[in-house]
UniProtKB/Swiss-Prot annotation:
<dbReference type="GO" id="GO:0005829">
    <property type="term" value="C:cytosol"/>
</dbReference>
<dbReference type="InterPro" id="IPR014729">
    <property type="entry name" value="Rossmann-like_a/b/a_fold"/>
</dbReference>
<dbReference type="GO" id="GO:0006423">
    <property type="term" value="P:cysteinyl-tRNA aminoacylation"/>
</dbReference>
<comment type="similarity">
    <text>Belongs to the class-I aminoacyl-tRNA synthetase family.</text>
</comment>
<dbReference type="InterPro" id="IPR032678">
    <property type="entry name" value="tRNA-synt_1_cat_dom"/>
</dbReference>
<keyword id="KW-0436">Ligase</keyword>
<dbReference type="GO" id="GO:0008270">
    <property type="term" value="F:zinc ion binding"/>
</dbReference>
<feature type="binding site">
    <location>
        <position position="238"/>
    </location>
    <ligand>
        <name>Zn(2+)</name>
    </ligand>
</feature>
<feature type="binding site">
    <location>
        <position position="213"/>
    </location>
    <ligand>
        <name>Zn(2+)</name>
    </ligand>
</feature>
<protein>
    <recommendedName>
        <fullName>Cysteine--tRNA ligase</fullName>
        <ecNumber>6.1.1.16</ecNumber>
    </recommendedName>
</protein>
<keyword id="KW-0648">Protein biosynthesis</keyword>
<dbReference type="GO" id="GO:0004817">
    <property type="term" value="F:cysteine-tRNA ligase activity"/>
</dbReference>
<dbReference type="GO" id="GO:0005524">
    <property type="term" value="F:ATP binding"/>
</dbReference>
<keyword id="KW-0963">Cytoplasm</keyword>
<feature type="binding site">
    <location>
        <position position="29"/>
    </location>
    <ligand>
        <name>Zn(2+)</name>
    </ligand>
</feature>
<feature type="binding site">
    <location>
        <position position="273"/>
    </location>
    <ligand>
        <name>ATP</name>
    </ligand>
</feature>
<dbReference type="Pfam" id="PF09190">
    <property type="entry name" value="DALR_2"/>
</dbReference>
Length: 499
């Protein structure tokens, strides 16, 4: 089964075919850097990170470009509020963006252009649109005439009579009055008094939001690219306007495939800063929710569907991740006990999905995983396959933790290693990587009730002595879900560490 992707432009699920064999050019709309990112941003960048990882695993040479919008009304407003420059606001929040994305295990884009660094390209594109009669100036502003693009509305599938005026909320009443058509949009905005600005043939000002992305796509990837990515909230007007200005300026199709992820919802409403119902990535991580829990939470739903954010759904993802993480850590922590090769503890390299020769059962699991991602990047099904692969390894883990590793046959050790290796490689395609438990320190111990833990360990020991191994396993599992991992020593002593 070849890779199939749902193309917003055609509303069809299509077989993917790149413009150049073996290469993929991808542009992803980035953030406006005026504040910390929230879970909605995390969803976009995690799902597109998986798409990129999958292309790499399939042997493609990928060029992935993601921009920073560092010129915007929101940034200017924040700079005014904090009595600093627009650049200071942008630089600080770009650093914070990298901190969050790195924490989530998201691969850094190959290129991350900024609007402030491609102003000449932006102005050149506006001048080209003027030459073609698709742009006009009015009181220092420059607007794109939407009627000059014959297929305006082809992405959002709306005609102008159905469009909502000022859908992005970035246009003032005065700007509306200067337009020839209510749906024309700004390519260049004249500077207001005292506002940071940039020189241009039309006077001091700054570029409009949409033209920034069009210019950066052209600068970094060329006139036509394979895939353009973004959230569903960007379909109109942002991506619709990108298409219009790029295709008029360049005379060519902007992107072959348009992919859009669904929104994260809170109480039935889209998570957004404007509604005030957002939770930042930083806040979630500070609460002790692991980065991999957030990845699993996001990837358990299909990327195009809405994702409801609730405490219960996040707790369920946390429980699931802890179960999976124990198995992913197995080869990193117990390889000597199992006579497995010593693994590279550093971040795993994305490997080819057809690299290893496997037995029939494991080969089937690998193919099912590939088929799931080929089916419009169905990470929900792909994750279920990871848990299926992990299940037989759980009994192996239990035997080690119960101090009975000598009962594991050499044949089982060998077969289990192949299974574990495949599991880690497939998990890495989803960006799910083992989080090794931290060794317990006196400071960390203060966050856990050690008396209760010792009592639980003794209760487990008594259960094992009485032959009630089911109860012993249940106690160990309950402690594990609370972030406590038990280590049974050969002398009968059980130690614990905080994971």
């Amino acid at each position: 089964m070849p890779l199939k992707l749902t193309n917003t432009l055609t509303r069809r699920t299509e077989t993917f075919s790149s413009l150049k064999p073996g290469e993929v050019s991808i542009y992803c709309c980035g953030v406006t850097v005026y504040d910390l990112c929230h879970l909605g941003h995390a969803r976009s960048y995690i799902v597109w990170d998986v798409l990129r990882r999958y292309f790499i695993a399939q042997g493609y040479k990928v060029k992935f470009v993601q921009n920073f919008t560092d010129i915007d009304d929101k940034i200017l407003a924040r700079a005014s509020k904090e009595n600093c420059t627009m650049n200071e606001v942008s630089e600080r929040n770009i650093e914070e963006f990298h901190r969050d994305m790195d924490a989530l295990g998201i691969l850094r884009p190959d290129r991350m252009p900024r609007a402030t660094r491609c102003l000449e390209e932006i102005k050149s594109m506006i001048e080209e649109l003027e030459k073609k009669g698709a742009a006009y100036s009015a009181e220092g502003d420059v607007y794109f005439a939407v009627m000059k693009h014959a297929n305006y509305g082809k992405l959002s599938k709306r005609d102008l009579s159905e469009q909502q005026l000022n859908a992005d909320g970035r246009v003032t009443d005065k700007e509306e009055a200067r337009k020839q058509n209510p749906f024309d949009f700004a390519l260049w905005k004249a500077a207001k008094e005292g506002e940071q600005s940039f020189p241009s043939p039309w006077g001091a000002g700054r570029p409009g939001w949409h033209i920034e992305c069009s210019a950066m796509v052209l600068q970094e990837l060329g006139e036509t690219i394979d895939i353009h990515l973004g959230g569903a909230d960007l379909i109109f007007p942002h991506h619709e306007n990108e298409i219009a200005q790029s295709e008029v300026a360049n005379g060519k199709k902007l992107a072959k495939y348009w992919l859009h992820n669904g929104m994260v919802n809170v109480g039935g409403q889209k998570m957004s800063k404007s509604l005030g119902n957002f939770t930042t990535i930083r806040a979630l991580l500070k609460e002790g929710i692991s980065a991999m829990t957030l990845r699993l939470f996001i990837l358990q739903a299909h990327y195009r569907k809405p994702l409801d954010f609730t405490k219960e759904s996040l707790d369920a993802a946390s429980t699931g991740w802890k179960r999976l993480n124990v198995i992913l850590c197995l080869g990193l922590m117990k390889h000597q006990t199992l006579n497995w090769p010593k693994p590279n503890i550093q971040e795993s390299k994305i490997t080819s999905l057809s690299k290893h020769s496997l037995n029939e059962t494991l080969n089937l699991s690998r193919q099912q995983f590939i088929d799931a991602l080929n089916n419009d990047i169905n990470t929900s099904v792909a994750i279920s396959i990871l848990f299926e692969l992990a299940r037989p390894l759980r009994s192996l883990s239990n035997q080690i933790e119960n101090g009975s590793s000598e009962l594991i046959s050499e044949s089982d050790k060998h077969t289990s290693y192949s299974r574990w290796l495949l599991l880690t490689e497939l998990a890495n395609v989803l960006g799910l990587q083992a989080e090794l438990p931290k060794t317990r320190t006196s400071k960390q111990s203060q966050n856990l009730d050690e008396v209760l833990i010792r009592e639980a360990i003794q209760e487990r020991k008594d259960a094992k002595l009485s032959g009630d191994f089911a109860k012993a396993d249940k106690i160990r599992e309950e402690l594990n879900l609370k972030g406590v991992q038990l280590i049974d020593k050969k002398d009968g002593v059980t130690e614990w560490i905080q994971s």
